[in-house]
């Protein structure tokens, strides 16, 4: 009762009533609209990733054209004729005791055997490259699965393909973290966070070293032709080393196929992804005012090598990217700028 009374407050006019309705109007659907209703897909990133995987799968799958079938049929007929003629020559040489002709037949058989063996080896390596895309799809399915039993077998197969020994600390931590009550999604997620980063770290180091060598070579060398040859050789070597890290043995045709897939992946991603990864701070640093033209060209070549390595890493990994574990081009850019500043 000791509190003073508050003064009276007078308003000049009446209170304004909000004329806008607080609730939206009712929306009803008839039977035809209800039957044709389809929910909207909100996950655009997964849709884009699915489009990229579809393009990669189409590129990996050989095109069965009529000319290809005719060529393969002709080669098969020619091979059968060569084998039949060789058998006939060998029988005639044995009957006539023509040891020179018999030696020539033996040499021809060795050459044909070596050729067939190389073709089979190339086909096996190319098939292994195609299987990596299917393994990535299987891993994506397991990451959304609530079943049990398949995840551990799948991860053990990946570790064996990558050459990870059973006594490796990362693999031992993974074995200690899993138990029988976990489903396939949890088992594969643990493998992706405990074992897979070991290979990813080695691939990142290879990309950083190749990008730095390309940057310094372009910044120092005055010969453009030598620069182009060096960059091409380093990029091919980088793709080979990344594929070897992830347990993929490349032959001649599989190496060309992987290089084609990397370039196709870069072209499919477009320039928007490049701008998003590099960021707007590229222009804000005003490199042209502080570095020479050759140094700026070297940084551009290094970024191209790094982007090539990232895409090769993405195609050779047996697991899809989870959370934010995908390497960013901006991280390599900062390293390249620092190395150029220290060198020049």
Curated annotation (Swiss-Prot):
Alphabetized InterPro entries for the sequence: DUF697 (IPR021147), UPF0283 (IPR006507)
Keyword Cell wall biogenesis/degradation included in the entry's annotation: no
Keywords per UniProt: Cell inner membrane, Cell membrane, Membrane, Transmembrane, Transmembrane helix
Keyword set includes NAD: no
Domain of life of the source: Bacteria
Annotated localization: Cell inner membrane
Signal peptide start and end residues: none
Pfam families: DUF697 (PF05128)
Chain ranges passing through the membrane: 70-90, 100-120, 213-233
NCBIfam families listed in its UniProt record: hyp_HI0043
Family, as annotated: Belongs to the UPF0283 family.
Full protein name: UPF0283 membrane protein YcjF
């Amino acid at each position: 009762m000791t509190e003073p009374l508050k003064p009276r407050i007078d308003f000049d006019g009446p209170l304004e009533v909000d004329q806008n309705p607080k609730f939206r109007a009712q929306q009803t659907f008839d039977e035809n609209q209800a039957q044709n209703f389809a929910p909207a897909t909100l996950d655009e990133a997964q849709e884009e990733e699915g489009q990229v995987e579809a393009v990669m799968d189409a590129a990996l799958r050989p095109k069965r054209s009529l000319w290809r079938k005719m060529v393969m049929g002709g080669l098969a007929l020619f091979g059968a004729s060569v084998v039949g003629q060789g058998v006939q020559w060998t029988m005639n040489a044995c009957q006539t005791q023509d040891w020179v002709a018999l030696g020539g037949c033996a040499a021809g058989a060795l050459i044909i055997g070596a050729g067939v063996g190389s073709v089979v080896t190339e086909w096996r390596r190319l098939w292994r490259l195609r299987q990596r895309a299917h393994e990535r799809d299987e891993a994506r399915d397991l990451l959304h699965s609530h079943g049990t039993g398949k995840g551990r077998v799948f991860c053990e197969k990946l570790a064996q393909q990558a050459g990870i020994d059973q006594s490796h600390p990362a693999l031992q931590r993974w074995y200690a973290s899993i138990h029988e009550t976990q489903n396939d999604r949890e088992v594969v997620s643990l493998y992706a966070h405990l074992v897979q980063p070991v290979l990813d770290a080695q691939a990142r180091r290879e990309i950083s070293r190749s990008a730095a060598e390309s940057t310094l070579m372009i910044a120092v060398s005055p010969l453009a032709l030598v620069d182009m040859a060096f960059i091409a050789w380093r990029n091919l070597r980088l793709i080979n080393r990344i594929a070897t890290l992830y347990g993929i043995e490349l032959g001649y045709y599989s190496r060309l196929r992987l290089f084609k897939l990397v370039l196709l992946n870069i072209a499919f991603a477009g320039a928007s992804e490049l701008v998003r990864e590099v960021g707007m701070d590229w222009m804000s640093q005003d490199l042209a005012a502080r570095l020479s033209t050759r140094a700026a060209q070297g940084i551009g070549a290094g970024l191209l090598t790094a982007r090539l390595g990232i895409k090769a890493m993405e195609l050779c990994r047996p697991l899809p990217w989870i959370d934010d574990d995908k390497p960013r081009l901006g991280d390599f850019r900062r390293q390249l700028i620092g190395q150029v500043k220290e060198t020049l």
